[in-house]
Structure formats: C-alpha cells, structure tokens
From Swiss-Prot:
Protein name as annotated: Excitatory amino acid transporter 3
Organism: Bos taurus
Keyword list, A-Z: Amino-acid transport, Cell membrane, Chloride, Endosome, Glycoprotein, Membrane, Metal-binding, Phosphoprotein, Potassium, Sodium, Symport, Synapse, Synaptosome, Transmembrane, Transmembrane helix, Transport
A Pfam family the protein falls into: SDF
Domain-level remarks: Contains eight transmembrane regions plus two helical hairpins that dip into the membrane. These helical hairpin structures play an important role in the transport process. The first enters the membrane from the cytoplasmic side, the second one from the extracellular side. During the transport cycle, the regions involved in amino acid transport, and especially the helical hairpins, move vertically by about 15-18 Angstroms, alternating between exposure to the aqueous phase and reinsertion in the lipid bilayer. In contrast, the regions involved in trimerization do not move.
Lineage: Eukaryota, Metazoa, Chordata, Craniata, Vertebrata
Intramembrane region residues: 314-344, 394-427
C-alpha cells in the first residue's frame, strides 16, 4: 500500500514542478495544429492575421518590458557582490569560453557546408529573392560597435542605438558644415574610373532598440565602484538587489501567461508564411545549418561541460528546457533572458553571483548558433555563384563570422548586417543575402536556442572553474558576519583602563569577555 502512494506522490510532485514546461510543450503542438488548420481551411486577410497574433504580441511585449531592469540590476549586483579580482577572473573565464565555443561552431559549420555542398546543385537564378539588402560598411559597423559601448546619454541608451549611414554628395557642391547636434558628418572620398571621385558624408543617427552593450559597460563600472567596501555604496547594492528580486517575481507572473502567448505566436507565424515552396528549394541548405546546430548543441557543448564539470550535461540541459523552448518560439536571446535566469538559478542551482554576471554578457556576445549560420550561409552563397573559395578566404570567413557574431548586439538588425559584413569580407555579392532571407525566420529560432544553451552551459562551467574563489568569498563573508565591525580600542568612563578595556564602534561596546552591550552614544 505504501509504494503506490509514494509513486502517486512523486507523479504529483513532477506535475507540480514541471507544469509550466508541459503546458508550453502542449501549447507548441496546439499552435502548429491550429496554424496548419487555419491556413488550410480559412483564408484570412492581412488584418485578420494581425489580430490573430495579438496574444503572442502581448507576450513579446511583456518579456521585453523586463529586459532592461533585469540586465541593469543583475549586472550591477553580480559585479558588486564579487571582489574586483574575482570578478576579473570570472569575466576572463567567461570570455575565453564564449570565444572558444563560437570559433568551434564556425569551424563545424564550414566543415559541414564544404562536405555537403548544398549550393553546388543549384543556381542563383533558381531561387527567388526576398527583401532588400542593407547598405553596410564593415568599418562603420565596427566603429558603431565601439561607439555604442560608450553612450553619450544613459537614458537614451535604454531605447536607442547609434548608427551611421553614408550619403552621396554631389561633386559640384562643396562639403557644407552642418551644425545640427543630432548628426555627425565626415567627408569620405572614393576613387573611381576616369579620375572621377565620389564624395560621401557619414551621417550619424539613432535607431530604435536597447543599447545593451553600452548599458553593460556602464553597469560593469558602476558595480565595481559601489562594490568596494563603501558605506554609501552598500545602499545602492541593496537597492539593485531588491530590484533584481522584484523583477524576477514579475517574470514568474509573466511565465504563467507564456503558454497562451506561445500558442498564438507559433500559429500566427505559420499562417503568415506565403510561399512554402522556398523551403523545398533551400532544403539542403537548411538541413546543413540544422545539422550543424544539432551537433554543436547535442555533442560539442555537452562534451565540453562534461570534461570540465564532470556532471551529466543532459540533466543540466533538461533544467534549461523552459528557456530553450522560449528561445525557440520568440527567437530572441535577450527576451529569453528572464526565463534563462529562472531556469539556471532555480532548476540547475547555479550560484546567483555567477548567473547575474555571466548571463547578461553571454546573451549579448555569445552567439554560437549565429556564427555557425553565418559561416554556412557565406560558403553556400559562394557555391551558388560557382566560386571556389581559397583556404585564405575560408579562414577570413571564420574570423569574420566569429567577430561579427560577438559584436552583433551592438548594431541594429544584427542578422542581416553581420551577414553582409561576412560576405563583403571575402568579396561575395552582398545582394545575394536576399536569397536566404525567406527561410531566415525559421533558422533564427533554432540558432537562438543554441545561443541560449551555450550561455547556460557557460554558467555551469564558469561556476566550476571559479569554485575556489567563491568558497573563499563565502568564508570571508562568514567572518564578517561573526564580527562585522572594525573595532576600535578605548577606555570607558569611571573604569580603570589597565584593568578593563572596551572596543567601541558605532553604538556597541565590547569588553574582553565578548559581552555586547548598547552604549548611550557613539561618540567617545
């Protein structure tokens, strides 16, 4: 009689602990079924499609709402609660991990696309083009990345990023001086045939979107400053700790709505797709990308985790299942960040000092899936154009894809912009990016899931490598709790200083027998 009761109890406990994950899986299945049925048996107008996706739009807006307070509070508290030397070591380990896994992903993608050759059997004119090619200068994009790391207005950085564009200037006109504060101009001259020149001015403007890099740099510096043993700084640390905890409670409320939002997100996207024929034409290319993402997430990342941490990587990945499903559905590492925090801290029990410091940085610069996708896409486009890439060009693609994926968060429309940068680096036609835009929305979801998984494994690996420093901080913290004050020696009134000595700080007096008593005043 006892065993069945225990099994029933375990089953109920499993449902209670995983109801959100199970309901999300059910929502995904229902979303696919509803999307296919509505697409097959009902012809919705564009306006009706827009209304149909409204519940999913609400989910996206709620998740994006908590990104800013979560990044700011978690970064500041994560850095402030760590010693400056410890935070430096943790940051270095995280960056080395990010760089190595991204480079491995790029190499894997190139090996697969060169072996499978998805573009050899097709021609450029056989694939329909979709969308427009963004005009991107590699130099300008890199400079914008650095500019966005140092925003001139912190409030503006919360909702806008800096971006430069080039405008052609008529040769007959002298370059004027524009005193408008909103634009920054520079004259650039490019030589063309017949000794003629084209003149450009680089115009600075702002585009919508959180300047994540700028906020992270500011929060990093602020966390280091207030994290020092400074009485007034502790007030700010407590404030941001409270803000972080409050934000996570809001995230818990949002996650209760998540299954409904995901259902309408996936169904709405299926209804919106107009031409499914493009998936057949680009089937081999998509299979190459998805194979690379699968190998990286199922073999490489778990293997690295197992070698370093010596724990079951698949159990760790199961703990991140809710975050991975969310990333798959909403296609945004930053918007998934609240769920990633919750899974890492509550399901996998990763130290909060690690997650708060590592995850915001990882969501910004660790883009394994994106780097793999860009490498595959660049070689695929070269194969479509019957171009044989040299070893030097392949190395260039590897380096550029790695660097571009790391800096993707610092530029608007990161997917297209970084893809154009990679193509331009090896002399491939940038306009051919329009050949793969039609399937990008689907591949983006899978590569975002790989990005989030890489961030999660990173927290576990960095925690293991930083175990000694964290234990030393715990011991130091316990010592401070036992004796939290710096005691100053003094003699109490009406007492013989040779026979009895007290140690006074603030409003406490401690004698040699370690008996604590309140004094009437803190001034002696």
């Amino acid at each position: 009689m006892g065993k069945p009761a225990r099994k029933g109890c375990d089953w109920k406990r499993f449902l209670r602990n995983n109801w959100l994950l199970l309901s999300t899986v059910v929502a995904v299945v229902l979303g696919i079924v509803i999307g296919v049925l509505v697409r097959e048996y009902s012809k919705l107008s564009n306006l009706e499609k827009f209304y149909f996706s409204f519940p999913g739009e609400i989910l996206m807006r709620m998740l994006k709402l908590v990104i800013l307070p979560l990044i700011v509070s978690s970064m500041i508290t994560g850095v402030a609660t760590l010693d400056s030397n410890v935070s430096g070591k943790i940051g270095l380990r995280a960056v080395v991990y990010y760089f190595c896994t991204t480079l491995i992903a790029v190499i894997l993608g190139i090996v697969l696309v060169v072996s499978i050759k998805p573009g050899v059997t097709q021609k450029v004119n056989e694939i329909d083009r979709t969308g427009n090619t963004p005009e991107v200068s590699t130099v300008d994009a890199m400079l914008d990345l650095i500019r966005n790391m140092f925003p001139e207005n912190l409030v503006q950085a919360c909702f806008q990023q800096y971006k430069t564009t080039r405008e052609e200037v008529e040769l007959s006109e002298e370059p004027g001086t524009n005193s408008t504060e909103a634009t920054v101009t520079a004259i650039m001259t490019t030589a063309i045939s017949k000794n003629k020149t084209k003149e450009y001015k680089v115009v600075g403007m702002y585009s919508d979107g959180i300047n994540v890099l700028g906020l992270i740099v500011f929060c990093l510096v602020l966390g280091i400053v207030i994290g020092r043993k400074w009485e007034k700084g502790q007030i700010l640390v407590d404030f941001f700790n409270a803000l972080s905890d409050a934000t996570m409670k809001i995230v818990q409320i949002i996650m209760c709505y998540m299954p409904i939002g995901i259902l309408f997100l996936i169904a709405g996207k299926i209804i919106e797709v107009e031409d499914w024929e493009i998936f057949r034409k680009l089937g081999l290319y998509m299979a190459t990308v998805l194979s690379g993402l699968a190998i990286h997430s199922i073999v490489i990342l778990p293997l690295i985790y197992f070698i370093i941490v010596r724990k079951n990587p698949f159990q760790f990945a199961m703990g991140m299942a809710q975050a991975l499903l969310t990333a798959l559905m909403i296609s945004s590492s930053s918007a998934t960040l609240p769920v990633t925090f919750r899974c890492a801290e509550e399901k996998n029990r990763v130290d909060k000092r690690i997650t708060r410091f590592v995850l915001p940085v990882g969501a910004t610069i660790n883009m394994d899936g994106t780097a793999l996708y860009e490498a595959v896409a660049a070689v695929f486009i070269a194969q479509l154009n019957d171009l044989d890439l040299s070893v030097g060009q392949i190395i260039t693609i590897s380096v550029t894809a790695t660097a571009a994926s790391i800096g993707a968060a610092g530029v608007p429309q990161p997917g297209l912009v970084t893809m154009v940068i990679v193509l331009s680096a090896v002399g491939l036609p940038a306009e051919d990016v329009t050949l793969i835009i039609a399937v990008d929305w689907l591949l983006d979801r899978f590569r975002t899931m790989v990005n989030v998984l890489g961030d999660a494994f990173g927290t576990g690996i960095v925690e293991k490598l930083s175990k000694k420093e964290l234990e030393q901080m715990d011991v130091s913290s316990e010592v401070n709790i036992v004796n939290p004050f710096t005691l100053e020696s003094t003699a109490l009134d009406n007492e013989d200083s040779d026979t009895k000595k007290s140690y006074v700080n603030g409003g406490f007096a401690v004698d040699k027998s370690d008996t604590i008593s309140f004094t009437q005043t803190s001034q002696f």
